[in-house]
Amino acid sequence: MKLNDLSPAPGSRREKHRPGRGIGSGLGKTGGRGHKGQTSRSGGTIAPGFEGGQQPLHRRLPKFGFVSLKAMDRAEVRLSELAKVEGDIVTVQSLKDANVINVNVQRVKIMLSGEVARAVTIGKGIGATKGARAAIEAAGGKFEE
């Protein structure tokens, strides 16, 4: 026996249903589409969100909010994530190398969440909340200004 000889056992698989192939199939003649009208025609679909001429929901509701472009190049880092950085100096580039932040990020702020495992020096261009700054300094770390 070879792979090209394999076939399912007779009766184990049902045949694909083919509408419009005779009365006996249960879906002959109109093929389950009913008589006349837009949806009976080929290509007769309506656009998503179309409500038959009534003002669609997405146009009835007001616009709101916006997407901040600042969010694209800024990131928040937890204290516990500083342990992933190799070396004693934490910079934006070292955070990128450790896959803590995205490569597009340009500004970083450290948040008070988790524990500081070791004393680290925080490089220029990295901000920190008051609590995070106090926790880093309590662990023996310092900030380069």
From Swiss-Prot:
Query: Which gene is the coding source of this polypeptide chain?
Result: rplO
User: Which keywords label this protein?
Assistant: Ribonucleoprotein, Ribosomal protein, RNA-binding, rRNA-binding
Could you tell me which residues belong to the region Disordered?
1-57
Feature: compositional bias, Gly residues: 21-31
User: Which species is this record about?
Assistant: Pseudomonas fluorescens (strain Pf0-1)
Q: Which Pfam families match?
A: Ribosomal_L27A (PF00828)
| Name of the protein in its database record | Large ribosomal subunit protein uL15
UniProt GO MF annotations? rRNA binding; structural constituent of ribosome
Q: How does it assemble?
A: Part of the 50S ribosomal subunit.
Record function comment: Binds to the 23S rRNA.
One cellular component term from this protein's GO annotations in UniProt: cytosolic large ribosomal subunit
Task: Give the matching InterPro entries.
Answer: Ribosomal_uL15, Ribosomal_uL15/eL18, Ribosomal_uL15/eL18_sf, Ribosomal_uL15_bac-type
This protein's record includes keyword Transmembrane helix? no
Protein family: Belongs to the universal ribosomal protein uL15 family.
**Gene Ontology biological process terms in this record:** translation
Q: Which residues form a coiled coil?
A: none
